[in-house]
Amino acid sequence: MASYNDYKEYKNKNHETMVFVKSGVFYETYDNDCKIMLDLFDYQIKNFKNFSRTGFPANNIDKVKEKLTEKQINYIIVENNIYQI
């Protein structure tokens, strides 16, 4: 749940920016950002009672960043509660 809390913290400050949170060897994103990942990469969405989540292996991050940049979608990557744009 810490990943989701980190996501919400950064998303509240950056409404129009996708937020990815590193969790172990995966990156996760939540809620409406999941729909973008579904459209671009066909990643499955897991629906929970209060939120939705999708994730991908950390070794795919360069592919994801390249596609988001190509589509002119802003994003933030959060690792260890430190973010990079």
PLM feature spans:
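Basic, polar low-complexity surface loops/patches
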Residues: 1-85
